[in-house]
């Protein structure tokens, strides 16, 4: 689902009787008002210009990787440990240790990740900003971040908030006796919130995201607006552990977790700390974004008792899971299976479970030295016992706690790194040597790279192979454009365009030219590598990109431009065994406006899906525009469809797409085929061009038309070629973290 696009309504006007779409009054731009209020269905091109350089106070020359490398990680760990074990009167620590709070903070930062579009996760430090900083599920995490300010203040630019939030959770586990799998620094702070689609609901805890029996809308993972994953009281507050298990399995699957990882994360996370529901929830004040100015960014101020410590209210549930809440052990499972449970309510009125018939009364310590408590559990905790699959997993851990420790360590490591992309992006001394399958491994370069002479020779072989400009450009685009800037997955490196599942994706036209291109490039690779001197070799992945570059040079020459398209060798080839088919399946594009492809079941019209794709490719509006225009004239459309190919000189890198789109002698109308396409007719009424919604939006939308006019001018051809090549090179190298 695209980012920050309002629902598409049947009309462009609102409910006002005079036809004006704005009900009430217009807001100042500084209040958030603007054109979107008047025309809610207009394309929001701002999603292509998020976190601009001018908003970054560190400046363009700032090198976070270099700064974080100077940190003494042992000293940093000690500083965090001191914060964790020093209770502050303004927010007293349960059991004298903030570790459980920091685990929750890290979990909730990373746990927003969802597989279907790769958005969410801990990168960027998004938990600091709206809406995440004010989600009901993140209540009181504002205090956790304030507790860490002395550490952030000390290390300043050397340590990002994004890294600190997650590393504090890792340190908390270690502080309480758990051995973690490792940690990678490298999360760079952003300075404004990502405009992410979190759901259609306009109220907290709304659940309009479901249809049918319990079908959750893609790409969402959480069950309700404002929750990280599932409702701890059960589906919509129905405290049915078996029904909750259904939500748990689906939500965690959409967070990239299997059943074992899911169970391990729940058991491991709930080995520590407690929930907070000391009194009536209606005594809790507004979230940070709605709180009074004088609260200085803190929210959820409670008027129940002291509002803190023993009187704290967060989720409204009052559960302490174990009798050792600041120590790693197997007590969660021992208690879960050691008692029978009955449904009760917390002092705040929330559903929870208590050990039946008063069993275990007094065995659970109070966080502030009060009388001992009875064992308690969440409805979702009991799901691990009543669901047959989770029950089989967790009962084994009850007898084999060392297996639980191993699985939790790996699952936690995956949780907090899933949005970081390949391990090449992990920094610091705590990065494990082992690379895991979910990290989409690619082999290290084990040969000498091709130089200028070899590159020139390979280009000649590719051009003489019989492959067309269209075939070569389409294949290179298919490989590289699988990249997602959200979770840094995909891209041309690894050469996975020839592996399952990518080779079979509908958007890649697997029964068309793709397999022919693959075979031909493999033959060129084999021939070159067998004859090249010394240890010089070329990978298939490099050849795919080089083929596209060679084709663009040929097309530019046909248009009268002698250019050299940049090419940086160094990609390697992954094997099918290094490729998790199920994990890669979610990268399959359901729409790619750059190729004029629109699959079935998309939630929005094609032009909105184009913006979403461009956003995932980290493209600006000018880059998106020049790429669409160039790819059209190069014949890179899905199945070579003529839609948007506004030129008589296909496979020639001209600005014809823009020139002909702006031609006032062409009249556009919907196709009589009623297939969502359009016909452009000349003055005689003859159909001259056909186009898609993606094509026509560049003439219809005022901002995009302004860009088209740049590239459609009489003097624009050189600039068009230059800008197209630059944008092409950017996409080809989006996954080259080894060189950038």
Curated annotation (Swiss-Prot):
Null allele phenotype: Cells lacking this gene are devoid of catalase activity, supersensitive to H(2)O(2) exposure and highly resistant to the antitubercular drug isoniazid (INH) in vitro. This mutant strain is markedly attenuated for virulence in mice and displays impaired growth in infected macrophages, but its growth and survival is indistinguishable from wild-type in macrophages lacking the ROS-generating NADPH oxidase (Phox).
Site location (Transition state stabilizer): 104
Catalytic reactions of this protein: H2O2 + AH2 = A + 2 H2O; 2 H2O2 = O2 + 2 H2O
EC numbers, comma separated: 1.11.1.21
Active site, per annotation: 108, 321
Annotated CDD domains: catalase_peroxidase_1, catalase_peroxidase_2
Cofactor note: Binds 1 heme b (iron(II)-protoporphyrin IX) group per subunit.
One GO process term, biological-process aspect: cellular response to hydrogen peroxide
Annotated binding of heme b, by residue: 270
Domain notes: Consists of two related domains. The catalase-peroxidase activity is associated with the N-terminal domain but no definite function has been assigned to the C-terminal domain, although it may play a role in substrate binding.
Protein known as: Catalase-peroxidase
Organism whose genome encodes this protein: Mycobacterium tuberculosis (strain ATCC 25618 / H37Rv)
